[in-house]
Design a protein with these regions (language model features):
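Bacterial Sec-dependent N-terminal signal peptides
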Residues: 1-21
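Glycine/tyrosine- and acidic-biased, solvent-exposed loop/turn segments at the edges of beta-strands
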Residues: 16-218
Length: 218
């Protein structure tokens, strides 16, 4: 009688016991999967259905802290991802599609300041990249197309004034480039052609007086 009562008490626990790391007759991953480091600590844990990751996957550093969290959708082809420092603060956040970076990715310092924002398409930089000072002020804007610099490139001083204006065309610097002093006066300017300085480049003092002229076509 005691054995019967003990068995009946164990039934609820047995019913909720999940096996892990299983594949079906077709070799497809099903249910909960876990992997560990050589030291025995958990590397990741998540769930599969017909070999496709589903729901939330948790990834860990070998020392035990949470490293990343991925929320899978679209039959496991896309994952909203958050990556963490060991202190638990957010390091990066963005989207993976078919295991490639896609859309907007943001990167943060260890004290939670946004340091960079990038736009991706199919794993390549595509769109605007913004870089920030540790104060949070904008430092740089650069445009990309299919993984190469293409379009306007602008840098700023800490106070928000423009520091430099330039441009890229197919990964090469092209057209006019201007550098400024912190007071807003032009430091120097000139042209780029095929990623090389071209023609006349003129340098100025902070008072706006022409100081040096160089001709790169001679």
């Amino acid at each position: 009688m005691k054995k019967l009562l003990l068995f009946l008490m164990l039934i609820p626990f047995l019913a909720f016991t999940q096996s892990v790391n299983e594949v079906d007759a077709n070799g497809l991953k099903q249910g909960v999967w876990e992997k560990t480091f050589n030291n025995g600590n958990l590397r990741y844990k998540g769930q599969f259905k017909n070999n496709n990751p589903q729901g939330i996957f948790m990834y860990y550093y070998d020392s035990g802290e949470l490293q990343a969290e991925k929320k899978f959708f679209h039959l496991g082809t896309a994952a909203a991802t958050h990556i963490f420092y060991k202190n638990g603060k957010l390091k990066a956040a963005g989207l993976y599609v078919n295991e490639l970076k896609d859309s907007t990715w943001n990167y943060f310092s260890t004290d939670s300041v946004l340091m960079m924002s990038e736009q991706y398409q199919k794993g390549q930089l595509n769109g605007v990249t913004k870089t920030f000072y540790y104060t949070g002020n904008l430092y740089e804007i650069k445009n990309w197309s299919e993984g190469v610099e293409d379009g306007a490139w602008v840098q700023y001083f800490m106070d928000g004034k423009t520091k430099m204006e330039s441009a890229y065309n197919g990964g090469k610097r092209e057209g006019k480039q201007i550098f400024y002093f912190p007071n807003g006066a032009v430091y120097y300017n000139g042209l780029y052609a095929e990623d090389k300085k071209s023609g006349v480049w003129e340098y100025f003092t902070e008072e706006g007086i022409s100081d040096t002229i160089m001709n790169y076509n001679e």
